[in-house]
Amino acid sequence: MKATKGGPWFYLIILLGSLKIDCRPRKKKEKKEFKFDTCNQTTCQELGKRLSDTINNSITPCNNFYEHVCNTWNKLNSKGRSKYMHRVDIRKLLHGLLEKSTIKKDAEIQATDMVKIAYKSCIKKKGKYKKEPEVIKNLLKGHGIKSWPLQPGTSSRNYLSVLNSTGLYPFLNVEVKRTKSSPSRNTLEVSAASPHVLPWTDWQGHGISKKKREKIKKAYKKLIKNVIKLLHPNRTNKKKIAASIMNFEESLAKLDEMWFKRIAGFWTEPTLHIKEMKNHLSKKFPIFLLLSNQFKKVNITLKSNQKVTVQNRYHVNAILECIQKTDSNLLQNYMGWMLILDYIKTAGGKLQEHWKTFKKEAKFSPEEQKEWKELCLDALVTEETTMYAPAANLYLEKYFPPIEKERAFLMISFIVEALANLIEKNDWMERKVINKAVDRLREVKYRIGYDDFFVNMTYLNTLYTFVDKENVTPQTPFITIHSMLRRNLELKRMQSLQTNEEEFDYRFGPFFTQGYYDSTSNTLIYQAASIQGIFSEEQLPKSYLYGGLGSKIAYQIARTVETMDITTTNSGVPGNVYVWSGIMAKNYLEAAKCLQKANRKAKDDKTPKIRFSSYVASTLARQAYVEAIKEDKGDYVLPGDQSIDSEQLFYYSYGQLHCRGAGYSYTVTESEERLNFLMKLDQIFMDTFSCPKYVHKLEAPGDDCTIIPEKQKKKRKPKKDTSLKLAAIGAVVQQILENNLTALLDSDIEVLDIIKV
């Protein structure tokens, strides 16, 4: 066809003629040059030695990667393996910080000063101190007990007068907790306290015979008598008073069986307006009156429509009935004794000596034997948390610089983006499922290193507004400081009923040494102690970090976005399926040549069934690693004679996560099967170690890799007159939702250790 003046070719020639075309040869785009310098720091030298000690080069990675990286490792005993594991001894670090700390004499006392003083007071007051009886009496007065003990049976007061002065503890706990129906508000919750030292209801469970039981009770009665004598040497009937306290404690403790046996009944955990609740308590117990007086101590006026929940109402009512029919002097004696027991472990002085004598004579210790300084740390930080936040502040300042938190977040951001890209750029999921998966990924919260308030001294000081700071001195007996701190914590929690401030769960604070996904709050947690020192080394190869820690974080993030009851296109998984079912069908099954179908033909096949989160962990971590070295335009390599390039180090770090005792809970056999199978499906691994192309052993002629679609169940028509049943079911479902069982169903929590640098 000839181009005419009015034809399309004519206009094309005119257009080309009008363009300025540069015919000079184009310069090639300069590639970003990545530097891979050798890391000569001590940490890298130790890591290089570890790999040379544990990698077995007589077994090729292509034949058996697990044996290649774990054969030598697995032969080590637990002590030998522990030197390669990342372990932070928080207790040792805290002892060092608190023992060597100094306090500025002229400056205003801060929260961190208080934990230093309290710790040193505890260590110092292990022995005797002056005016011990007066110190203990003042402690009891602080809890509303003006005189202890009293003669039973001579009371001129009723039980309400006693409880109005002392509060409900140690009979009942009154706590401020989050409202289940409204996660941003607080409410009141009442439950049985049961602070008993002896196993009154479970002697047999502790392997205690009847003969030994009587010996323990005799020694316990003597302990009470000795404490009475310490406070009131001239008090008559000490033995009788001690016996009455012990017998009442035993009878009250036996009510705990109602809790352990979970006595069933209608409305066991009612939630009502506090003024109405008395109608459902024993003899219309005036709980509104008593709690109103208690909350006045923090300037809160309880309203009659304040909601309160009673946990196990039958148990609580049994305790209230016992209170109402008991002599008020005996009630006060019991309450005073329980309070003394609360402080006796670290009381020091003669009180501590009497406690030791009891344990020696009874040959029974209610708790694990510990050094004195360990008991002091427990009382302030690790068991009780009255001084957790200031201690954490000191630890973070010394051992966890902000750069570690920043680098950890950077790693996570790379992994999250890699996973988001994987979700969005696929052809095996429906668009609505993609959107839901991405939304779920974006909703995950991260607590990395520490919560910011731990490094805010102004905020930390507000946590101790009810402490008489002038009385917190090295000369103050620890039992006095301890009681002030406990009382302060109690009052601050009461105050939160009005402020709606959420109680911090210190179990997952900076001292938490494990990586953890909390399904209840949809939060991935890697606190300071779990990653301390890992990101602080400037030259530590990123291939090592991302292959090990990065793979574990990638696994846990992939697990967080798995969710039940989402259907995907061409899903071959019966029943409820995970959001990743389509991914598994497209990738996992395709790579394994329709493993589901093949397994139906070969039921004896031992190929491990691997969930997508495990399958994709190393892939996501590697993509994140690539982004990390782009960010820094390079990485470091290890020193040594053995040549280990960056890609190989990544897979070595990942592979050794599967070694014995290195973190995963699989058996050696399971770990070997899983790791080898995963690596055979990883094309980059195969290329890195020059392995031959993998052909699945179950591949057979005729397999067409057809995914069998899920058969939908027919919906049953509801029967007539089922309104009452449906209402009951609705109530049960509501309870299930409130107890967050849905989150538990899709949690599959795994706690993973970190291999040491």
Predicted regions and their residues:
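Noncatalytic, helix-rich "gating/capping" subdomain that lines the substrate-entry/channel surface
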Residues: 93-415, 451-454, 463, 467-475
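Intrinsically disordered, low-complexity linker/terminal regions across diverse proteins
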Residues: 33-35, 245, 251, 271-283, ...
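Solvent-exposed, acidic/flexible segments
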Residues: 55-62, 83, 87, 91, ...
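Cleavable N-terminal signal peptides of Sec/SRP-targeted secreted and luminal proteins
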Residues: 5-20
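Hydrophobic/aromatic-rich, well-ordered segments within soluble, folded domains that form packed cores
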Residues: 54-75, 203, 207-229, 431, ...
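Extracellular/periplasmic catalytic domains that process cell-envelope and extracellular macromolecules
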Residues: 57-61, 181, 516-520
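Short, solvent-exposed loop/turn elements at domain surfaces
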Residues: 73-77, 197-199, 534
